[in-house]
Amino acid sequence: MSKTDVSGNAKKGRKGLIVTVVAIVVIALAGAGFWVWHQQPSFCNAICHKPMDRYVETYESGNSSMLSAVHAKQGKVCLDCHEAKLDDQVAEATAWVSDDFTDPVAENTFQYNESFCLNESCHNMTRDELTESTSNMAFNPHVQQHGDIDCGECHKAHSESVMYCTQCHAEAEVPDGWMSYSDYMSAKQS
């Protein structure tokens, strides 16, 4: 083999290595960019379109009666509450592609219970501290006499929140943008 043959093979080998390294870097950067985009609310309705549009709209709306808008103002994104599990995402993608999804998405597929909401990542307080923080209300919804009520019974993420107290206390003041319990039940049945 002549020197030029060896040198030509070496150049081809280096060129192939450079192309391979560049391809790996481009794929890694594209993957990282996709991962960052995947964590943004805009991803949810850019990919899934119709079933997620209304949820991203409530996130962006600023309507303080919806948890998603309140959380958006605090810098929270969808994946802070909706954990991205691969099996769930594959099932959701399959439902979307096959046009076999519920619209609107079923409301109670996601439970906001005390341990989910009252922790270091979200509302860093105990149940007693929460009860104390709402003690100035005429009907304190967080007192223990009401039993175990999930946070999501009142605080709705993507629809009007519900003043659950009005189920028993019809005279309880309903915050702006919220629904009374009877209005909620009527809307749910229609």
What role is predicted for each listed range?
Residues 2-190:
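Short sequence/structural segments immediately N-terminal
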